[in-house]
Regions:
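Conserved HGGG/HGGXW glycine-rich cap/lid loop of the alpha/beta-hydrolase fold
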Residues: 4-50
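Conserved acidic catalytic loop of the alpha/beta-hydrolase fold
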Residues: 60-77
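Gly/Ala-rich beta-loop-alpha elbow adjacent to hydrolase catalytic centers
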Residues: 81, 85, 89
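Flexible "cap/lid" loop of the alpha/beta hydrolase fold
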Residues: 102-134
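Conserved alpha/beta-hydrolase catalytic His-Asp/Glu region
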Residues: 138-198
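Short beta-strand/loop motif that positions the catalytic acidic residue
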Residues: 200, 206-208
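Acidic catalytic loop of the alpha/beta-hydrolase fold
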Residues: 210-215
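Catalytic histidine-centered segment of alpha/beta-hydrolase-like enzymes
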Residues: 238-251
Length: 261
């Protein structure tokens, strides 16, 4: 599994979301690496990591990530996940024995009824648009008004995002060979199972953007019901990616939570 390491100190794993890569974490990477050794992965079928053989699912990705951590002597590492990656770190926390402290940022898998269709349909349309727009993506990424028109579902303040961050992310979305299959699995596959109270003994925080238009804020209550040992942190004025919209607050939450482990 391709990954980058930056900084020195206690290891900290970063797991990106659907279509992303390790570069998704660039807004907070250096701040975290100032005090931690950051390991940011490209999940299978993303970035420079080839796709999995066979079915592509949350369970399969969780198995692959567990194997990677064991191979890197990182079992028990503190971890942060975003979106699909947030669901992955919750799943590994549920299984037990793989991760230390966990911060799960706007996790998927807690939708019901029409929310599944909204999630699938909106991202299905978005990825097709992003693929069509690749020839002009450098212009879109570099123009604040164009970024705002393209990314309102992902960010509460697209005009403030780094053009390079947006270009990297949109290139990664378009290039991921596993995007379509994972999108369908996330929307219509198995829902995220939970754990009984007291099952998770390491620090666990679920963070949610108040303006998330991918994983709707109403789903946070369901996530807490399934992971009753978790603490919920709300990010105000924030969309689906807290590390994009409120990087300083996100960095502080991560460092404070993982310092307890």
């Amino acid at each position: 599994m391709h990954h980058i390491r930056r900084g020195a100190g206690k290891p900290l794993l970063l797991v990106h979301g659907l279509g992303g890569s390790w570069r998704s974490w660039n807004p907070i990477l250096d701040a975290l690496a100032a005090t931690r050794e950051v390991i940011a992965v490209d999940l299978p079928g993303h970035g420079r990591t080839p796709p999995l053989d066979g079915e592509v699912s949350i369970d399969a990705l969780a198995d692959a990530l567990t194997k990677f951590l064991a191979g890197q002597n990182l079992t028990g590492v503190d971890a942060v996940g975003s979106s699909m990656g947030a669901r992955l770190v919750l799943e590994l926390a549920r299984r037990g024995g793989t991760l230390g402290a966990v911060v799960s940022l706007d996790p998927g898998g807690f939708w019901r009824g029409w929310e599944r269709h909204f999630f699938y349909g909106s991202l299905y349309a978005s990825i097709r648009l992003v693929r069509r727009l690749q020839p002009v993506m450098p212009f879109i990424a570099g123009n604040a008004a164009a970024r705002t028109l393209l990314l309102p579902q992902l960010s509460a303040r697209p005009w403030k995002l780094s053009p390079q961050l947006v270009l990297d992310e949109m290139r990664s979305f378009a290039a991921s060979p596993s995007f379509d299959e994972l999108l369908h699995q996330l929307a219509y596959g198995a829902t995220q199972p939970g754990v009984p109270p007291g099952a998770i003994t390491r620090p666990l925080v679920i963070g949610w953007g108040r303006r998330d238009r991918v994983c709707l804020p109403r789903q946070a209550k369901r996530a807490l019901a399934l992971f009753p040992d978790a603490r919920l942190h709300w990010f105000e004025h924030c969309g689906h990616f807290p590390h994009w919209d409120v990087p300083h607050e996100t960095t502080r939450l991560i460092l404070d939570t993982t310092a307890q482990s």
